[in-house]
């Protein structure tokens, strides 16, 4: 058996992200080793012109400062599809309509409620921004559903993008670039609540099953499928399950804070997906344990610096 030494990382003044990632690779173990392997794998996925990359996003990544990163990956053609929660779409729209996300330290939740402020960790939102969100969405829904009362979730998100004028919006950029956004849990969000409110006076059919047709077509139109999985939950499972009929993904990078001992999907190592044919035998898989808002920007910057 070949035993490799663990080399100690050398951090120097003025070093760039690519050098930092290489030092992590010299260590090669624990979190540093995983970050290095994830960076190399992501670069290989981007370089592979025959690979479609699906990006799965769960958790508060848009309010957590990653809106621009996701938007740019769509705009430059890196990803072929985005699978996300309704909450991230909600927060993208909140900013598209002129709202914002705020930061502070220290909080009293009862006082925040009295002041019309909602909290996500140490991220804050204002109720007046959601009031604009509500009125804007009702107008957009009226325009869309008057022409298309029967529509899939992906088609609805695409149509919403056509009504936006914020160039930094994930939804608008996906609309312009023709990149589909899938949100299988859309109803479980403020955007979903607005849809329910619209149906109090209007009859529509939001067809979730129809999304599987376009997603399946996308899966089978590419030689290889890769995945960037940030967080877990429904977006992660929807992403992996979409490749089941082709034997699974060929490569994937996962960043999660969850643990595997309870059998949770969110904490499941990617290798487990092989038993379900959601990852190919011999597929290249890397799981990094940690906060995606801290780790993914570093991994992505490292991958892009080597292109």
UniProtKB/Swiss-Prot annotation:
List the EC numbers from the record: 2.5.1.46
Write out the catalytic residues in the record: 278 (nucleophile)
> What is its cofactor?
NAD(+)
> Which reactions is this enzyme annotated as catalysing?
[eIF5A protein]-L-lysine + spermidine = [eIF5A protein]-deoxyhypusine + propane-1,3-diamine
Its top-level enzyme class, in one word, is transferase
Q: Which PANTHER family does UniProt cross-reference here?
A: DEOXYHYPUSINE SYNTHASE (PTHR11703), DEOXYHYPUSINE SYNTHASE-LIKE PROTEIN (PTHR11703:SF2)
Q: Which HAMAP family match?
A: DHS
Q: Which family does it belong to?
A: Belongs to the deoxyhypusine synthase family.
Its recorded name reads Probable deoxyhypusine synthase
Q: Which gene encodes it?
A: dys
